[in-house]
Design a protein with these regions (language model features):
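Short beta-strand segments
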Residues: 84-86, 108, 138-142, 221-226
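Divalent-metal-activated hydrolytic enzyme cores
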Residues: 13-14, 32-76, 111-123, 127-135, ...
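Thiamine diphosphate
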Residues: 54, 78, 94, 98
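Glycine-rich, flexible N-terminal cofactor/catalytic loop recognition
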Residues: 69-81, 86-91
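Active-site cofactor/substrate anionic-group-binding motifs, chiefly glycine-
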Residues: 87-112
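Boundary at the C-terminal end of the N-terminal hydrophobic targeting segment
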Residues: 28-30
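N-terminal secretory signal peptides and thylakoid transit peptides that target proteins
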Residues: 2-20
């Protein structure tokens, strides 16, 4: 191309090669920007289930996980949901729901126990709801949960476990007992009942959660994550 007619073609190609990646990153960052105001509970739940579908389909987006994304949230956080999950190393909510930094507020405790855990778990959940205005709490159990399995064995064998483990399984035993007599796999029933017990506890928890549940501004649901398939299935009717 003649210089009098504009920038030579060779220079245009060089400029495109130099600035193309930068433009792509800026466009991607713009697409991944979050609305700082939390969505409602139904939309938050749809987002989580859609992310899990991507995870099981092998089509994860893995959004907002760069150092720049972490720095962008250094001044505040706007999670869509609280996930109360087991501490099991195979359960990683950010991965199985295909979300990025700042999307979910995760509280992890062995057996995803709510009852009897004191101010640490309760205060963490209440903080997310009261201060961060999170509209959804999801209690997430998982297949083959060792804590529930230990509680079931504790009841069946009437044995004693060492240290604080014994106290932990004592908190799960009522849910295991409630699952007795249900049709189907005894361990799976106990795991689902343990999740449901946690959901019921949170729905009644005063003074922060229960009024919001009653007013319809907070939803508490339960689900179970299948370690074999990666799928998350809601635990009965979402309330």
């Amino acid at each position: 191309m003649n210089d009098r007619l504009g920038t030579p073609r060779r220079e245009i190609v060089m400029l495109a090669a130099a600035f193309g990646p930068v433009c792509f990153r800026l466009m991607a960052a713009a697409q991944q920007e979050r609305d700082p105001h939390p969505v409602n509970a139904d939309q938050a739940l749809r987002d989580l289930l859609a992310g899990n579908h991507r995870f099981t389909a092998g089509a994860t987006l893995m959004p907002r996980r760069s150092p720049e994304d972490f720095r962008a949230l250094s001044g505040g956080q706007f999670p869509e949901a609280v996930i109360v999950s087991c501490a099991d190393s195979r359960v990683a909510p950010e991965i199985l729901f295909d979300v990025g930094v700042g999307d979910i507020f995760v509280v992890r405790v062995a057996g995803n126990v709510i009852e009897g855990t004191g101010v640490i778990v309760k205060g963490s959940i209440e903080y997310a709801v009261a201060e961060l205005n999170v509209p959804l709490i999801l209690v997430l159990g998982h297949s083959g949960c060792g804590a529930v399995k230990a509680a079931k064995k504790h009841i069946d064998d009437k044995d004693s476990l060492p240290g604080a483990i014994n106290g932990l399984v004592e908190l799960i035993k009522p849910a295991v007992a409630r699952s007795k007599g249900m049709s189907g796999d005894p361990l799976e029933n106990a795991i689902r009942q343990n999740v449901e017990t946690g959901v019921e506890k949170l729905q009644r928890m005063e003074p922060i959660l229960a009024p919001r549940v009653k007013a319809g501004t907070l939803k508490v649901v339960g689900a179970v994550y299948d370690l074999q398939t990666g799928a998350v299935a809601l635990n009965g009717k979402a309330k």
